[in-house]
Design a protein with these regions (language model features):
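Amphipathic alpha-helical packing segments from all-alpha helical-bundle domains
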Residues: 119-144
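Hydrophobic/aromatic-rich alpha-helical bundle segments in the mid-to-C-terminal region
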Residues: 126, 145-188, 195
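Helix-turn-helix
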Residues: 16, 24-58, 62
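Thiol-/selenol-based redox modules, centered on thioredoxin-like
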Residues: 186-191, 309-325, 330-359
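Hydrophobic alpha-helical connector segments
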Residues: 75-105
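Amphipathic alpha-helical segments used for helix-helix packing
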Residues: 99-119
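Short, internal strand/loop/helix patches
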Residues: 278-317
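Generic hydrophobic, amphipathic alpha-helix propensity
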Residues: 13-21, 38, 63, 67, ...
Length: 359
């Protein structure tokens, strides 16, 4: 048998650590889980665990992301109206609550307490929730284009469902869970006064003519499929504190790829993958893909795509975008309003250099 390469050995060890950690978290919960026991389960050393994951929380997020991305998806009829779609989405959500799982502790029951305990995770999680609301709202609008902006309805639905999740953990058995489904259905008739305002930021994109050579073909977190970035459209490089800005580009009518970047990829990239995967699991049951927004979401853990777009460094406050046409970058902008400016703005007559300290 041929010897494994160093990369193959590391990948195998990582998979063993993830499997061992999932068993440990399922049996003991996050707080009582021990890295030493995880190492023993994986038949590796404690150092081998830490060579793959910087800490127990990063490992926990990675386990949850892996589980969410590989969760089987039942075949259901998607909703044909906003009310139906919200109902199907809510039913798919509540079917995954801790009381419906076979794990003794429920793998995800400690997620929100761990996120809430640290500003490092709270701010990105808030923007990940905003991204979820944008995607769900745009998908609902695809079901009924005459309904107007539905992002606030999506926010209300996600608030209701996350509240139900928290109570299912803290007070199991409280309330009738299918009343939560009916409450979400009723949100279709809620007048939230939601309107899409004109962008107040007058950022002018720069005219450029540069090759666009993305180094990898990442995975679209919304579909789980490869996302080649060779077509025309907007590539928005967004730190995890700026994710809601992607709506500006999508509203402009462009094909948009949101490239998620962070200064803490080992911990926050799995959290991003988890959050989008959980939305995807319910969205694919509730809304036909033909109604989904023209948006792809990819995670740029090592910054390779950001560098290809002209950003040698990117962090959680980054907001930058490029417009690609026929394999060339034709305009770009950075800072607040970059997504909107690049998607709809008239190019400026000079090159605007990247400023990696702008936000």
């Amino acid at each position: 048998m041929a010897r494994l390469t160093r990369a193959e050995m590391q990948e195998r060890n990582r998979a063993r650590v993830l499997a061992a950690a999932r068993a440990e978290f399922a049996e003991h919960g996050f707080r009582e889980a021990k890295v030493d026991r995880i190492a023993d389960r994986a038949e590796l050393t404690r150092g081998a665990v830490y060579s793959n994951f910087p800490g127990k929380r990063a490992l926990y997020f990675a386990v949850l992301a892996e589980a969410a991305e590989h969760e089987p998806h039942p075949s259901t009829e998607p909703g044909l109206t906003v009310r139906e779609a919200l109902g199907v989405f809510a039913r798919a959500w509540v079917a995954r609550l801790p009381m419906a799982t076979g794990d003794r502790h429920g793998l995800g029951v400690d997620l929100i307490p761990e996120v809430a305990a640290d500003e490092l995770t709270r701010r990105p999680f808030a923007q990940l929730m905003a991204l979820d609301a944008v995607v769900l709202g745009l998908a609902l609008e695809g079901v009924d284009p005459a309904a107007g902006r539905l992002v606030r309805v999506a926010e209300a639905a996600l608030t209701t469902l996350h509240g139900a999740t928290a109570l299912a953990t803290a007070a199991p058995g409280f309330g009738e869970i299918f009343n939560v489904v009916r409450a979400c259905e009723q949100l279709a008739d809620l007048d939230t006064g939601d309107r899409w305002p004109e962008s107040p930021i007058d950022l002018v994109p720069a005219l450029v003519d540069e090759p666009w050579t993305p180094p990898t073909t990442p995975t679209d977190l919304l579909t789980g499929a490869p996302a080649p970035l060779t077509g025309d459209g907007v590539v928005a490089v967004l730190g995890l504190h700026r994710l809601a800005a992607v709506e500006q580009a999508v509203r402009a009518g462009a094909d948009v790829t949101a490239v998620l970047v962070t200064a803490h990829p080992d911990e926050l990239a799995p959290l991003a993958r988890l959050t989008v995967a959980e939305l995807r699991a319910c969205l694919r049951q509730a809304v036909p893909e033909s109604a989904w927004p023209r948006l792809r979401v990819v995670c740029d853990e090592r910054g390779f795509l950001a560098a290809a777009a002209g950003l040698p460094t990117a962090d959680d406050d980054t907001e930058a975008a490029i417009r690609v046409e026929s394999g060339r970058i034709v305009r770009r902008a950075q800072g607040y309003g970059a997504c909107h400016a690049t998607a709809v703005g008239s190019p400026a007559p000079r090159v605007q250099p990247w400023n990696t300290t702008a936000s």
